[in-house]
Amino acid sequence: MLKTKQQIIALNRFRCWTSNLPGLQQQCRNQSTVTAASSEWEQAKPLSEMPTISPFQLLRHFLPGGKYTNLDTTQLMLAFRRDFGPIVYFKGSLGKPDVVMTNNPHDFEKALHNQGIWPMRPGMEYLSYHRQVHRKDIFQGVEGLLGSQGEAWGSFRSAVNPVLMQPKNVHLYFNKMSEVNKEFMERIRKIRDPQTLEVPDNFEEEINRWTLESVSVVALDKQLGLITKNRDDPTPKRLFKALTDFFEASGDLEFQPSIWKYIKTPTFKKAIRSLDEITDITKMYVDEAFERIEAENKNRNVEKPENEKSVLEKLVKIDKQIAMVMAMDMLMAGVDTTSSTFTGLLLCLAKNPEKQKKLREEIMQLLPQKDSEFNEAVFKNMPYLRACIKESLRVYPLTVGNARTQANDVVISGYRVPKGTLISMNSVTLIKDDAHYPRASEFLPERWLRASKENEKSAECPHALKASSPFVYLPFGFGSRSCIGRRIAEMELELGIARLIRNFHVEFNYPTDNAFKSLLISVPNIPLKFKFTDVDN
């Protein structure tokens, strides 16, 4: 294992070294860029002139009775923009770094192109503490992706990238995920009210079970039976509760002044307890998966062909400890995130029946029967479904934006921002603004489609609906630190929504105001009493 890690680190360093050996022509271009940047820096205003507030004044606003008390993260970002304008500087205190918070997509682009070879996305230091200190017996120096930084992050990412970012590896799971989705459809039929056809208030738990079952197909290479067979197993409920507790605590620890490094606060203790529970349960699942893989390999006369090996088998071949931590990260990061995205899309389709009808027409051409199977050709030919997912992520964003520590000095909105400063890029304040998304209050999947001769003169021509900048909202991140589970999450959503819309007409006959609350990510905030009416075959 040590040899493997040393090889990964050496490879990373070699890549960094070779990336600094450009040709003479590139050197000239770089020199020109440096000169332009130097001139821009000289003409920019000093950071001291940027709108700001003292750490003490900011802390007062978070105390009981303060104007930022009890705001969720989305509400907080909107309040900051209202109070300080498009950009504000917060001096670091209580363990927090200096932060420049901007609401300008041009700043987003500059900050994301200034993130360096190992992009720093600070945050979740309590997760690093949990893995490095509190449970170092389990993690043994392998931190994973969620809370690590620098070379440790780069080494781990380099190890798992070839497996998780390879489309053909993800496509191994068409049939297994299809079985999970069929089981979910039958569960909906069983739990809905026979008269109203509405599902119970706690349908969110059913969505979470479906999501965890789907993620487990990849992370653990098996179905856990959470939808029907093993419903009475208390372990999944413990995991769901721990994940919820973790996200609730994380929202406070990430976005509000915290003194947990000095005093172990109740919120910090809650986060650590939930991480203990998540770690113990996911390790149990992962250990079972390892035992199963070893038993299967012993019973084989010949080694399984490489193109038939699962993601977990390929990760184990790299390093067993890396495989275990990556499986944990997939389970931790892949349940609530996908559940919230799935819920947001269902709400959008339920409240926009004409868009749901258009989507169903696309799906029925590819899946003529309710139980028709997916294949790669079908999977590639669903542009409107993908557009619906992208638009729902705009309407119901999963996070408030992105953040990166700057690798070099940079000019942001005309101000000098020194390297090492954290730039917070607040997309959530822009995505409902007509200046950035025309007709921003409407659910318009068409804005994500390619223009055609038929629609180029219509009001729904994609060119007329595009964002003001591709950097306004990047739900899966940007560059080398973009979401490593994107392909898995997209396939899970596409297969799940396609199967559901092929089987049911979806309605939601209740208000959707404040449908989500914003913690570390957005999570449902209302009972999800969807009405599911069967669609004819």
UniProtKB/Swiss-Prot annotation:
Q: A GO molecular function for this record?
A: monooxygenase activity
For this UniProt record, give its keywords in alphabetical order, as a comma-separated list: Heme, Iron, Metal-binding, Monooxygenase, Oxidoreductase
The question of whether Cytoplasm is a record keyword is answered with no
Which SUPFAM superfamilies does UniProt cross-reference here?
Cytochrome P450
Q: What class of enzyme is it?
A: oxidoreductase
UniProt keyword Heme present: yes
Q: Which residues bind heme?
A: C483
The family database entries (InterPro entries) matched by this protein are listed as: CYP11_CYP27_families, Cyt_P450, Cyt_P450_CS, Cyt_P450_E_grp-I, Cyt_P450_sf
Q: Its Enzyme Commission number?
A: 1.14.-.-
The record's listing under Gene3D superfamilies reads: Cytochrome P450
Note one Pfam family from the annotation.
Answer: p450
Query: Which cofactors does this protein require?
Result: heme
Q: Which family does it belong to?
A: Belongs to the cytochrome P450 family.
Under which name does UniProt file this protein? Cytochrome P450 CYP12A2
Source species: Musca domestica
